[in-house]
């Protein structure tokens, strides 16, 4: 757990929207290291990769062989942990617990250490999606401390539900990092895919309602008939868009977060101060007892 004080009020954030090779973790690692090198040359503090960025998405029977642990002696993570001595990283991978359950996971790496791991808590198993057949459900939503302040991570379907971002907000997260492997759906006569419009609307809304920074990194490319659209975004605590990546192509989207904006916004709009958490808990208990 990070215990040092925050030493920067500006955070240079980069979002990497990459294509991945399904099941080829070593090839995907090489791409990560290349993007890390690019981001370092731009003085980036934190580089965020998409959901399952080390493995690809439609893994199915490749899940077990693609799993890795975010520890020093792991053949993949040792390189990423070493890279994190110079730049903080969020990477997507398949995690495995001591009883051989497999999770869709994001790891926050900093200073050569794993600071936090989030296991995806909502696994879509409908329509195009089949995650519940192959993965275990995460059971925690926790914020964590970094050298830039307190953050939280969610993965795709997690933020299609209102409760995980709300829990992160109450747990002290001022910067929310969302990562996705979001396939395109709802193409019509408008410029944007409906899935892209929906994600951008909801991330903007979370930033506004929770007076927090919200960043979203989504992968690109095609995999097993699915098309991933990219379109990275960053919103400030006023809900204003401060960065937007291109659609349908690999890119790094750079932004600078002025962390003083948290104070300015919350002094004017004290939604966090006035949040009645005890009321929420009491009403949830009543509803659950029905």
Regions found by a protein language model. Give the residues of each.
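Cys-nucleophile CN-hydrolase/nitrilase-fold catalytic domain and related Cys-dependent amidase chemistry
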Residues: 25, 34-121, 182-205, 209-212
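CN hydrolase (nitrilase-like) catalytic-core segments centered on the catalytic cysteine
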Residues: 72-90, 156, 160-252
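A short C-terminal boundary segment appended to hydrolase-like catalytic domains
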Residues: 263-290
């Amino acid at each position: 757990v990070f215990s040092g004080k925050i030493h920067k009020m500006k955070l240079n954030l980069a979002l990497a929207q990459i294509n991945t090779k399904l099941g080829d973790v070593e090839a995907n690692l090489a791409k990560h290291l290349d993007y890390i090198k690019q981001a370092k040359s731009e003085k980036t503090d934190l580089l965020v990769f998409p959901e399952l960025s080390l493995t690809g998405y439609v893994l199915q029977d490749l899940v077990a062989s693609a799993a890795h642990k975010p520890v020093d002696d792991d053949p993949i993570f040792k390189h990423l942990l070493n890279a994190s001595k110079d730049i903080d990283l969020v990477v997507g991978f398949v995690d495995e617990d001591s009883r051989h359950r497999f999770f869709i996971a994001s790891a926050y790496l900093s200073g050569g250490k794993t600071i936090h791991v989030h296991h995806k808590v909502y696994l879509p198993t409908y329509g195009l999606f089949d995650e519940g057949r192959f993965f275990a459900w995460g059971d925690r939503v926790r914020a964590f401390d970094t050298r830039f302040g307190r953050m939280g991570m969610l993965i795709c379907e997690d933020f299609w539900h209102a409760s995980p971002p709300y829990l992160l907000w109450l747990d002290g997260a001022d910067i929310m990092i969302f990562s996705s492997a979001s396939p395109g759906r709802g193409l019509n006569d408008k410029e944007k895919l409906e899935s892209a419009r929906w994600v951008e609307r909801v991330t903007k809304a979370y930033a506004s309602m929770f007076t927090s920074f919200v960043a979203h990194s989504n992968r690109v490319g095609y995999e097993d008939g699915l098309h991933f659209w990219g379109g990275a975004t960053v919103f400030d605590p006023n809900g204003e868009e401060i960065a937007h990546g291109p659609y349908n192509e690999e890119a790094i989207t750079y932004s600078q977060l002025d962390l003083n904006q948290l104070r300015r916004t919350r002094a004017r709009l004290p939604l966090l101060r006035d949040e009645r958490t005890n009321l929420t808990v009491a009403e949830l208990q009543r509803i659950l007892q029905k």
